[in-house]
């Protein structure tokens, strides 16, 4: 897998996460209901939800129901969230410094 496989440069730690996750199924974060998509699903999910139209600077990487998680294209490793029904109208909210921090925060909240 190349860092620019999706037409932009993936953040370092997210790229590392994708190369380590060898499965074709989404990465389920504990029992939280949050999944991070496998690399094979990323383009399809972004096309399905028309992310390029509503939030062209962001790339969908996972979700829990209507709540979606994103990275910013050609940017740092920050993870953002937004409601899929509010894309383009509500500002993205930063929720973690990187994908590993995000996973750890979710797992800690489950305890």
Language-model segments: residues:
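Compact, glycine/acidic-enriched structural inserts
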Residues: 87-109
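Small/flexible residues
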Residues: 74-75, 96
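A surface-exposed partner-binding patch
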Residues: 1-70, 109-111
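Short conserved micro-motifs at the rims of enzyme active sites and ligand-binding pockets
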Residues: 71-74, 91
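Charged, low-complexity surface segments at secondary-structure and domain boundaries
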Residues: 1-5, 84-90
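Intrinsically disordered, low-complexity regulatory segments enriched in Ser/Thr/Pro
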Residues: 75-87
């Amino acid at each position: 897998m190349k860092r620019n496989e999706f037409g932009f440069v993936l953040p370092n730690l997210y790229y590392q996460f994708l190369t380590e996750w060898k499965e074709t199924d989404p990465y389920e974060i504990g029992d939280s209901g949050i999944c991070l998509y496998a690399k094979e699903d990323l383009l399809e999910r972004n096309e399905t939800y028309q992310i390029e139209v509503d939030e062209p600077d962001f790339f969908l990487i996972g979700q829990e129901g209507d709540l979606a998680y994103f990275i910013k294209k050609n940017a740092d490793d920050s993870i953002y969230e937004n409601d899929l029904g509010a894309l383009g109208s509500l500002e993205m909210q930063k929720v973690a410094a990187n994908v590993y921090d995000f996973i750890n925060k979710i797992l800690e909240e489950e305890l």
